[in-house]
Amino acid sequence: MFQLNAPYRPTGDQPEAIRQLVDGIRSGAPAQTLLGVTGSGKTFTVANVISQINRPTLILSHNKTLAAQLYSEMRQFFPNNAVEYFVSYYDYYQPEAYIPTSDTYIEKDLSINEEIDRLRLSAISALLSGRRDVVVISSVSCLYGIGNPQDFSQSCISLVKGYTQDMAQLLTALVNSQYVRNDNELTRGKFRVKGDTVDVFLAYSDYILRIEFFGNEIDGLLTIDPVTNQVLEEFDSYNIYPATIFCMNPDKQAEAIRQIKLDLANQVQYFHDIGEPLYAKRIEERVKYDMEMIQELGYCSGIENYSRYFDGRKPGTPPYCLLDYFPKDLLVVIDESHVTVPQIHAMYGGDKARKDNLVQYGFRLPAARDNRPLTYEEFEGKTGQTIYVSATPAEYELKRSEGIFIDQLIRPTGLLDPEIEVRPCDYQVDNLMEEIRLRVAKEERVLVTTIAKRLTEELDEYLRRYGIRSAYIHSEVDTLERIQIMEDLRKGLYDVLVGVNLLREGLDLPEVSLVAILDADKEGFLRDYRSLTQTAGRAARHPNGKVILYGDKITPSMKKTIDETNRRRSKQIAYNTEHGITPTALNKAIESSPLIALMRKEQAEKAALEQKIHDSWKSAPWQQYNKKELEKASEKQRRAMLEAAKNLDFDTAARLRDEWLLMEDKLQAME
């Protein structure tokens, strides 16, 4: 089961917190709250609880950046266990919508991050493998529909060395599991056949599974490094999980389409009855086109809006989500619960309002409403025992824990909560520049928070203009890029990081000695008590930690933050004095996030493959052709490209297109 790997033992009030949490879980407590200050080792406490309880665990975070940090830390604590990452795989996502006031229809537009898609599949595969030593770090993506776990499990291909297996049946099974055959370029989610060998680049892993046949018998099962082609490991049996989370059971397709057509007829009749023939015509054309695509290709754009039919669910029932892939006795840890819980509450309402317009005006069938996130009540119904973790828990968490919370105020390093100073807003940027230069001289880092994305970018540009090595992050900065920027801050490539609300909960940056909060007296969402306390906590991992609140008045939130910080400081000072502890800096190794390493590896492999293809073009026979010969070859290449696209072999079509464009460039140069 779980094997905790840590170079240190629980200290301070960690042992008592671990004991209380473990006792609470074993006694059947439905919910507990861990009130732990920044830097007190809440993640280490949770890791100890997981290792003692030995249950599959879901750790829920409210944004991708913090989820990535938790993923990195948990991988270090549990190197021999399955630590997985499940967040939204969209780099960009514009949902389908209709705005009645301007009669504007917005089509769905998206960009999928293949690496995060692989990690999501890896999480699903680990849960369905039957392993109990699984920790999944997730964002609110775990609330959204991802397909029936039974269909996903049935699409799994089980292989056993020495058993009879017809190769043709295996290839058909791979296609049904959404793998694509490509004998030229073997990339993630594809397979190739060479003689008696089938190579499958697993969609959820970074290696190739080689299946060797001797007649109709499986003679070997090996994993291969895709770059070096070296054998990594041999197996007696192996399970191949599908290449996509959304698996359609062929047996359910006919019944699903019959039900869709029935609901379509009812909806068309409804629109005619209320005197809206335009909406009736619109929904009829759209759904019939989608049905033709599904029957011909097995999918259509926006197929998720028909998920209820293919899942076999009744109207109004919750979609299958990540939680359905866990066993019933899962443990749920909600990190920074004061933010995450309200976020879970908000997911359903926003989605419903958008879907209602699409249904009301004839763009989607009513079943589209069932492709949605869980309501909070549904989420609670699917979760097991829960631990809420926060430095500033809200009333809801305390109520669920029956008013009892577990304090964790003492840091193992003896570090105190930072001193807080209030300064006027006049010339706040000039004053900030002086403070930054003092920290830069000591090789310390600075975090600055503003109240708007535009101000973040403008301040970053201003600091750079005066020679400060600055960077900024906000919601429009790509997930993996945010992680990279924070790593670069720790390494000293930047001295200052400017942000809005991303510089709050959970960010672990021990080199930061100063947190500056601009416009701290602007009472509101980003300047309430919890936001100020969480932001101030970013300076609590440094012995010289200090917080400057720039404001012309002291708001109730500012006063509460200062009072609570002073209360904690007094307790921490008393504990240090009693035990003879001298506060010491947290020497945390700067280790690259595994997500960054995976991203770099993927980029290197892609670049190497592209270079190999381009090198082959340099020595291609057409490079020696005269103009007439090249024109003929170019036209032949163009036809081959169109034929490949017609056959839906888009990888081959793209490769042919790139070579054809080179031919066209050479033809233009000849003129």
Predicted regions and their residues:
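Walker A/P-loop
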Residues: S27-V49
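Pre-Walker A (Motif I) flank of P-loop NTPase domains
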Residues: R26-T33, R55-P56, R132-V134, E444-R445
